[in-house]
């Protein structure tokens, strides 16, 4: 018996998206970003699908936020290059990086101090992060020369040191700040050895000059556009997730009757309501407004009333023939998650990563 609700993950779409991103950035290696449980698609699901060399759809490496994520990927048998995008947090983490062959970002002086205070069995591969304008992590231009020299002189650091930055506005292509960041990064790193990586998903899709040695696609890998008002399908990408549930009740509803907590919505006509087995306890946003679409039997029907913990209600219409057990699609190929996110007033990243453990993640 299939569980409901569930997130159906398409291995074919994941592979197709990786192939498409390689076409968009043919001169770059791909560091597939699988942090936050593979953007809600299942960390090992994604890593294993994209290390299938027999399918010609294997990533060159994987980007993760936390050491625990990287260790889970290694324990799952994935031998590809791994990069900790937030770097290590404690000096005790460094021997684990060596043992499991994990690259690390270095973005703060405290990490330099830890690298200089330990004795390691072999050097760690480091990606030095430059703050080119994001002002979140990374070293300023005034610090760069000294930091780079410290890394070069440290026997615990493998040579060459690799170089990276992160864009703050690449998902707003009308702004020229990304070009400013690229120029800043290139001026600081000109002539230095080592690989470079600048481009996140928006960089890959909208700023081809940023693609460099490695690209770091995250949301685009899952078939979703990083840009408001855009769809992944506009770039030849396919959504890898379909969030589905089912109708657990169909009810006759009279004009003037309300539904749900707070009697928030009142019917203006006689109709039929459907109750869908998903709610904010599953990660579907409680603040989804009236009219947010759900797909039932191939047609869009609006949410009515408040989303509750385990259920939401949709207006099926007065002539609906839908029945208990019918499939309800919350987002997917026929109902893009970008559109649902815009309707709710959030971003697709948040929707796919906030699904709770009650939602079964099922790889096809």
Swiss-Prot record:
E.C. number(s) listed in UniProt: 5.1.1.1
Reaction catalyzed: L-alanine = D-alanine
Entries under Gene3D superfamilies matching the protein: Alanine racemase, Lyase, Ornithine Decarboxylase, Chain A, domain 1
Annotated GO MF terms: alanine racemase activity; pyridoxal phosphate binding
Catalytic residues in the record: 35 (proton acceptor), 261 (proton acceptor)
Binding site for substrate: 136, 309
PROSITE patterns: ALANINE_RACEMASE
Cofactor: pyridoxal 5'-phosphate
Keyword Zinc annotated: no
A GO biological-process term: D-alanine biosynthetic process
Record carries keyword Isomerase: yes
Pathway connected to this protein: Amino-acid biosynthesis; D-alanine biosynthesis; D-alanine from L-alanine: step 1/1
NCBIfam families in the cross-refs: alr (TIGR00492)
Family the UniProt entry places it in: Belongs to the alanine racemase family.
Cited function: Catalyzes the interconversion of L-alanine and D-alanine. May also act on other amino acids.
Name this protein carries in UniProt: Alanine racemase
Organism: Shewanella amazonensis (strain ATCC BAA-1098 / SB2B)
Gene behind the chain: alr
